[in-house]
């Protein structure tokens, strides 16, 4: 029988409040395999992020979408003072495990990890005088749906995130190239700029429209899982994640508004300066905002 319900996430994943799309544990486990550890980060990404933070004299960093902690671990290893938060306790357990395993290293013993929600971030996180940099990378912000249909929760979340940045500090936030996805129905053909994973076998893209407006993009991942076959051979695991399709122009307006317009803003396409109409089609847009007041 045909399933008449369009499932936006893998079964067992929470659907109330800010959705934890990794709540069943299995998606979190497979995602950890997919992204790997800090060694699986591309050299280009690592060099770009570390260079950006050091160029602006950043030391105290808030990772507002730390997931399993892979970016935070990289920053802690590089000498930054890091606070890491995420709404998914299933994802955070991997970060907490790494901190425990490396607790004898002072930098890891001082690493702060908390569960927090973007919609209540101003209450969940004590920012003090603000962080030198706040990062929200890996298409993480697109996990927040537009439940009310007016993007009010997007605006609230971005305002809360921006409030964590000290005057003169940075917000670094990204999203996939949804302009391309919505116009073609598939993701750009380039490589993943963040992960060197060789376990991905297939990613299927679907676009859900409501009243002729793109409302959601779902990605169905098929990932090779080593040693799960009956004879010890690799098996396969599938899971679905849903995202709000932020287009470049509209997201630019949202994120600038979060700072009340008091910011310097630049857009990169796959870590390179982006110019509308350029020949190269980026997989990700990265927004770098410097708070000016």
From Swiss-Prot:
Modified residues (N-acetylvaline): 2
Chief localization: cytoplasm
Keywords: Acetylation, Cytoplasm, Folate-binding, Methyltransferase, Phosphoprotein, S-adenosyl-L-methionine, Transferase
Binding residue positions for (6S)-5-methyl-5,6,7,8-tetrahydrofolate 2: 6, 215, 240
UniProt keyword Nucleotide-binding, yes or no: no
Similarity comment: family membership: Belongs to the class I-like SAM-binding methyltransferase superfamily. Glycine N-methyltransferase family.
Annotated positions of the Phosphoserine modification: 10
Protein name from the UniProt record: Glycine N-methyltransferase
Residues the record lists as binding S-adenosyl-L-methionine: 22, 31, 34, 41, 65, 86-88, 117-118, 137-140, 176, 221
Subcellular location: Cytoplasm
Assigned EC number: 2.1.1.20
GO CC entries: cytosol
């Amino acid at each position: 029988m045909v399933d008449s319900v369009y499932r936006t996430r893998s079964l067992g994943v929470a659907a109330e409040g800010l959705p934890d799309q990794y709540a069943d544990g299995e998606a979190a486990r497979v995602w950890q395999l997919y992204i790997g550890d800090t060694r699986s980060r591309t050299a280009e990404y690592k060099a770009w992020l570390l260079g950006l933070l050091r160029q602006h004299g950043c030391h105290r960093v808030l990772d507002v979408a730390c997931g399993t902690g892979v970016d935070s671990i990289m920053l802690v290893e590089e000498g930054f003072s890091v606070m890491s938060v995420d709404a998914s306790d299933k994802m955070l357990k991997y970060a907490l495990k790494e901190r425990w395993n490396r607790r004898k290293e002072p930098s890891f013993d001082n690493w702060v990890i908390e569960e927090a929600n973007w919609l209540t971030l101003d209450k969940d996180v004590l920012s003090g005088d603000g962080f030198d940099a706040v990062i929200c990378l890996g298409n993480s912000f697109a996990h927040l749906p537009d439940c009310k249909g007016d993007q009010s929760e997007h605006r609230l979340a971005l305002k809360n995130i921006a409030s964590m940045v000290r005057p003169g500090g940075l917000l670094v936030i990204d999203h996939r190239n949804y302009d391309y996805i919505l116009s073609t129905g598939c993701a750009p053909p380039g490589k993943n700029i963040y992960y060197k994973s060789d376990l991905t076998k297939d990613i299927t893209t679907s676009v859900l429209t409501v009243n002729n407006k793109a409302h959601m993009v779902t990605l169905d991942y098929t990932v090779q899982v080593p040693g799960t076959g009956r004879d010890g051979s690799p098996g396969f695991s599938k899971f679905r994640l849903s995202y709000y399709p932020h287009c470049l122009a509209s997201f630019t307006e949202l994120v600038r508004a979060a700072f009340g317009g008091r910011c310097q803003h630049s857009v990169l396409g796959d870590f390179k300066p982006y110019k509308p109409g350029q020949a190269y089609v980026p997989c990700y847009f990265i927004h770098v905002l410097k708070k000016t007041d």
